[in-house]
Amino acid sequence: PCRIVEQASEPGDYRFGGLFNNMALAWEDLGEYRKAEAYYKKAMDIMEALRPGSLLEIAVTWVNLAVLYEKAGREEEIDGCLEKAVEIFRSGEVPRDGYYAFNCRKCAETFGHFGYFRIKKELTEAADRIYREAGEEPGR
């Protein structure tokens, strides 16, 4: 299926970032950690070329890599991934909108899992604030 998408798209098409991230998650679920890492890195390469519009996708990929490294027994690489993700979440380049809130909420639990409780709280509060300002109930 990836070959079909490759034939129908230009190299570097932003959709490959999401496709490669999803392929990485599939390989990760199958226990194929090296293949998963390769696809996360392919996704990262595409998204890096699309900065700054892809910053949140890059942050999520760093968080995904941290989870992968835990499963693969590569704990020494986890903190570096999470620190890069935090840097992006705190960046002034990222609009504080609904998509930001969604990604904050999506990643907050993972930060908590790794003991980054202040970051978990920071991301959760940021998401709640955005949802409240939009008239939504936080935590949904």
For the regions a protein language model found, what residue spans apply to each?
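Asparagine/serine/threonine-enriched low-complexity, disordered tracts
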Residues: 4, 21-22, 42, 63-64, ...
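Short coil/turn linkers that connect adjacent helices within long alpha-helical scaffolds
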Residues: 7-11, 49-53, 91-95, 133-136
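Conserved alpha-helical positions within TPR/SEL1-like repeat arrays
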Residues: 14-29, 56-71, 98-109
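TPR/TPR-like (Sel1-like) alpha-helical repeat modules
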Residues: 83-87, 112-135
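Amphipathic alpha-helical segments of tetratricopeptide repeats
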Residues: 2-7, 44-49, 86-91, 128-129
